[in-house]
Amino acid sequence: MGLEEKLPSGFLLTTVEGLAGYARKGSLWPATFGLACCAIEMMATTSGRFDLARFGMEAFRASPRQADLLIVAGRVSQKMGPVLRQVYDQMAEPKWVLAMGVCASSGGMFNNYAVVQGVDHIVPVDIYLPGCPPRPEMLLNAIIELHRKIQEMPLGVNREEARAAAERAALASTPTIDMKGLLR
């Protein structure tokens, strides 16, 4: 007989990681990094029609030290890249990044020297949200997907090793502007 048979019915069994993931996913504090038209759609998501508060995100944080989700909305110029990295480094662990819009994800239609071809060359991105600009419903769907990822994330040393390996791989990749292909 296992432990499950000896406990009274209705008794909840879970792992510490599962419980911590459930608590973390319901208490995300987003910081905005709105740089273009995607920021307007991000602001619309906080309105009563879409009700971002039901996901535990009542207010966007003004300081990165109070946030654990960075939503990069819009294109990032080369001069803004170090500022984005500084904001990311100031955030408390655990932290997540959502690249909102095609400009944040891959540079969008701005294929020139002045625009970073994807913020994943500056910070590690957890969720990519396509669209130009993506609708508030798509942002809500991306947040739900991020909740699923957070629920399944390991705790402690395993999480730190996985995060460090992902960041090293992303920063060591070839920049999109250096890639040669059919569109060049």
UniProtKB/Swiss-Prot annotation:
Instruction: List where the protein spans the membrane.
Output: none
Q: How is the cofactor bound?
A: Binds 1 [4Fe-4S] cluster.
List its EC numbers. Answer: 7.1.1.-
Name the Gene Ontology biological process terms. aerobic respiration; electron transport coupled proton transport
Name its co-factor(s).
Answer: [4Fe-4S] cluster
Q: Which reaction does it catalyse?
A: a quinone + NADH + 5 H(+)(in) = a quinol + NAD(+) + 4 H(+)(out)
Keyword Phosphoprotein carried by entry: no
**Amino acids binding [4Fe-4S] cluster:** C37, C38, C103, C132
Q: Name one Pfam family in it.
A: Oxidored_q6
Please provide the record's keywords in A-Z order: 4Fe-4S, Cell membrane, Iron, Iron-sulfur, Membrane, Metal-binding, NAD, Quinone, Translocase, Transport
What is the enzyme's main class? translocase
Per UniProt, what is the membrane topology?
Peripheral membrane protein
Where, per UniProt, does this protein localize?
A: Cell membrane
InterPro entries reported for this sequence? NADH_UbQ_OxRdtase-like_20kDa, NADH_UQ_OxRdtase_20Kd_su
UniProt keyword Manganese, yes or no: no
Q: What is the role of this chain? A: NDH-1 shuttles electrons from NADH, via FMN and iron-sulfur (Fe-S) centers, to quinones in the respiratory chain. The immediate electron acceptor for the enzyme in this species is believed to be a menaquinone. Couples the redox reaction to proton translocation (for every two electrons transferred, four hydrogen ions are translocated across the cytoplasmic membrane), and thus conserves the redox energy in a proton gradient.
Record's subunit section: NDH-1 is composed of 14 different subunits. Subunits NuoB, C, D, E, F, and G constitute the peripheral sector of the complex.
Instruction: Please report which protein family the annotation says this sequence is part of.
Output: Belongs to the complex I 20 kDa subunit family.
This protein's name? NADH-quinone oxidoreductase subunit B
Q: Where is the organism placed in the taxonomic lineage, from the top?
A: Bacteria, Bacillati, Actinomycetota, Actinomycetes, Mycobacteriales
